[in-house]
C-alpha cells in the first residue's frame, strides 16, 4: 500500500513598513495608537507561532523596492504598509506588480477618512487586497488574509 505524505512547510510572511513607521507609538497617537512595533511584533509572532514572521522597516523608498524584489521566492506573502509612499510611489507599485509574491496593503488608520491626499493609493490596484483602519490589528487581519489566500 502506498502512503502519501503531504509536506507542509512553515508559511513565511514579511511585514514591510515604510516611511515614519519607526515612530509608531510616538507619532500622532490619536491616529495611530500608542503601541510601538517593538512591542507589537513579538506579540504578533507569539500569536502566530506556527508561522515565520519577519519584520523590516525603512524610510527609504528604494529599500522598500529592494525588499519586495528579495521577497520573491523567500516569503509566501508580504504585508506592506508603505506609509506616505502609498500615495506617491510608482516604483513601489511597479515592484509589487513585478513579483509573484502576494502583497496585502496595510494601513493603521482609515486612509479614506483622512485628508484628501491620503485617499489615493497607487499600491491598492496591484495588491491582492487592502486592510485599513483597524489600528495595529490591521496586521493581524493581514496575516489572516494571506493565510486564506494561500490555502
Describe every region a protein language model picked out:
Residues 23-38:
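Glycine- and acidic-residue-enriched helix-capping/strand-helix junction motifs
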Residues 10-14:
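Extreme N-terminal starter segment of soluble prokaryotic enzymes
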Residues 71-78:
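Short acidic/histidine-rich motifs immediately flanking catalytic phosphotransfer sites
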Residues 54-55, 104, 113-151:
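Short, glycine-/small-residue-rich phosphate/pyrophosphate-handling segment
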Residues 19-21, 83-86, 109-111:
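Short glycine-rich anion-binding loops that position phosphate/pyrophosphate groups of nucleotides
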Residues 63-67:
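Short acidic active-site motifs
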Residues 89-100:
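Short Gly/Thr/Asp-enriched flexible loops that form oxyanion-binding sites at enzyme active sites
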Residues 54-62:
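Short beta->alpha junction loops
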Amino acid at each position: 500500500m502506498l502512503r502519501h505524505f503531504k509536506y507542509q512547510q512553515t508559511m513565511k510572511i514579511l511585514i514591510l513598513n515604510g516611511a515614519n513607521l519607526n515612530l509608531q507609538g510616538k507619532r500622532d497617537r490619536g491616529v495611530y495608537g500608542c503601541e510601538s512595533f517593538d512591542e507589537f511584533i513579538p506579540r504578533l509572532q507569539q500569536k502566530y507561532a506556527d508561522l515565520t514572521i519577519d519584520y523590516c522597516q525603512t524610510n527609504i523608498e528604494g529599500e522598500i523596492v529592494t525588499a519586495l524584489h528579495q521577497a520573491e521566492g523567500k516569503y509566501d506573502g508580504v504585508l506592506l504598509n508603505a506609509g506616505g509612499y502609498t500615495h506617491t510611489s510608482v516604483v513601489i507599485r511597479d515592484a509589487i506588480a513585478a513579483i509573484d509574491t502576494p502583497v496585502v496593503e496595510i494601513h493603521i488608520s482609515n486612509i479614506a477618512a483622512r485628508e484628501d491626499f491620503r485617499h489615493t493609493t497607487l499600491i491598492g490596484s496591484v495588491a491582492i487586497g487592502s486592510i485599513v483602519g483597524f489600528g495595529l490589528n490591521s496586521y493581524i487581519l493581514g496575516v489572516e488574509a494571506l493565510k486564506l489566500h494561500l490555502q
